[in-house]
Amino acid sequence: MIFDYIIIGGGIVGISTAWQLKQRFPEKDILLLEKESIYSMHQTGHNSGVIHAGVYYAPGSLKAKFCKTGVASTMAFCDQNDVPYDRCGKLLVATNELEMERMHVLFERCQQNEIDVELLGAKQLKSREPNIVGLGGIFVKESAIVDFQQVSVKMVDRFVEMGGDARLNHK
């Protein structure tokens, strides 16, 4: 068979590329190849699972915009495909004055990027997490965690349901 597109690599990037291509071009023959016996066995399967809100990116930058869109689209995909995730937020802690100054900068950056964030003093930090020692920090409410291997498997399922061809154990 001749394919219009062949995507090599069954991690989250390869899988999401194949799935997006199939959504945009349903008439095209698309093949996803993965050398391992399961999807997302390497980097995707070994990351921390954080759905990043974009705390560190310059206001108005493409990275900031993509993070904002990515949080929403990742959670929407999870909701639509019964993939559990935890919108637990992310706590960044300052342990000295210099880091506390950086927290203020990050807090401002988050506000400019329209990220829901809370600036915490030492008492607020301690009440949120009694085992943390710090001068303060920020709590990024939009951050979440998910098992990206589960996301990957569901995405491959959607890709195949749309007529895509996905093959494991292929080099």
What do the predicted segments below correspond to?
Residues 18, 22, 158:
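Gly/Ala-rich phosphate-binding loop of Rossmann-like dinucleotide-binding domains
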Residues 34, 87, 121-122, 168-170:
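Short loop/edge segments at beta-strand edges and connector loops
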Residues 22-46:
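Glycine-rich FAD pyrophosphate-binding loop
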Residues 49-124:
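Dinucleotide-binding Rossmann-like beta1-alpha1 core, especially the glycine-rich loop
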Residues 1-13, 31:
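Beta1/beta-strand and adjacent pyrophosphate-binding region of the FAD-binding site
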Residues 138-171:
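Helical element adjacent to the flavin cofactor pocket in flavoenzyme catalytic cores
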Residues 46, 98-101, 128-135:
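A short, glycine/Asx- and small/polar-enriched loop/turn
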